[in-house]
């Protein structure tokens, strides 16, 4: 059975993560990506009474990252074995760009896997690392 495609999507606009220490996470993501903080806080959709978010942006990179604090947060570390998010992957142009990101991660003292090359089911390379709340992040280049 062939599925019909929906309307066109031009890309992912942003992602948002709930974090245990908003200030520490804002500083970490700003250091890594060089993002600017949007100068106001956003109320968390459908949790306005307990949560709010900060948005970090860089139009040059075409990326926006939302970080949310919530008073109902129990302070547990992220675990991809629970229902919800597994990881977030950032595409880069090629393996040389991956090497540049490895150097950046090393400069900031962020532990990572190093570049891992895969051939199946297609040729790609990744670098995997984690944010302060243990959310798995990766850079990926195809080819």
Language model features with spans:
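N-terminal beta-strand motif that seeds the catalytic metal site of vicinal oxygen chelate
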Residues: 1-26, 49, 85-90, 143
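Core segments of cupin and vicinal oxygen chelate
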Residues: 18-64, 69
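Acetyl-CoA-dependent GNAT
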Residues: 68-74, 142
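Vicinal oxygen chelate
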Residues: 1-8, 12-20, 54-55, 59, 76-143, ...
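Short catalytic micro-motifs in class I SAM-dependent methyltransferases
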Residues: 14, 33, 138
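A short, acidic/glycine-rich surface segment
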Residues: 39-42, 72-77, 114-115
């Amino acid at each position: 059975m062939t599925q019909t495609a929906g309307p066109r999507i031009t890309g992912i606009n942003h992602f948002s993560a709930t974090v245990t220490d908003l200030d520490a996470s804002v500083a970490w993501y700003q250091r890594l990506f060089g993002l600017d903080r949007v100068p106001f806080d956003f109320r968390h959709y459908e949790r306005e009474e307990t949560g709010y978010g900060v948005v970090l942006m860089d139009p040059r990179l075409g990326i926006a990252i939302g970080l949310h604090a919530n008073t109902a947060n129990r302070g547990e570390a992220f675990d991809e074995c629970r229902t919800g998010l597994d990881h977030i992957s950032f595409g880069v142009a090629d393996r040389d760009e991956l090497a540049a990101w490895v150097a950046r991660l090393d400069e900031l003292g962020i532990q990572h896997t190093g570049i891992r090359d895969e051939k199946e089911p297609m040729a790609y390379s990744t670098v995997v690392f984690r944010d302060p709340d243990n959310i798995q992040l990766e850079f990926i280049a195809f080819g």
